[in-house]
């Protein structure tokens, strides 16, 4: 179920302060964050945000199509290496 419109988008305050500071100064350095739950807002367009995936920070360049999505959607947490090969089929 989506978030109520009367509540507005959720964004952690510490991340919002970092974004506003970067926009104000014109800084292009990636902003490190662990806040995967924060929503992407229009002031973030053009910034690179390094989102933590549990192991490392994945750089995410924010574009206008990403507005309304969460930061965690763009930093996958699981790596799929494929299923194990069938050893019986290889012998024949």
From Swiss-Prot:
GO terms for cellular component: cytoplasm; small ribosomal subunit. One of its GO terms (biological process) is translation. It comes from the Bacteria. Gene3D superfamilies: 30s Ribosomal Protein S19, Chain A. The keyword RNA-binding applies. Keywords: Ribonucleoprotein, Ribosomal protein, RNA-binding, rRNA-binding. Protein S19 forms a complex with S13 that binds strongly to the 16S ribosomal RNA. Belongs to the universal ribosomal protein uS19 family. This is Small ribosomal subunit protein uS19. The gene is rpsS.
């Amino acid at each position: 179920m989506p978030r109520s419109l009367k509540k507005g988008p959720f964004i952690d305050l510490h991340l919002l302060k970092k974004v506003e500071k970067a926009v104000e100064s014109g800084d292009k350095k990636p902003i490190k964050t662990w806040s995967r739950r924060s929503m992407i807002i229009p002031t973030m367009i053009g910034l690179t945000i390094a989102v933590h995936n549990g192991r490392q920070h994945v750089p995410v360049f924010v574009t206008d199509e990403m507005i309304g999505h969460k930061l965690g959607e763009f930093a996958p947490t699981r790596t799929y290496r494929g299923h194990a090969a069938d050893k019986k089929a290889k012998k024949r």
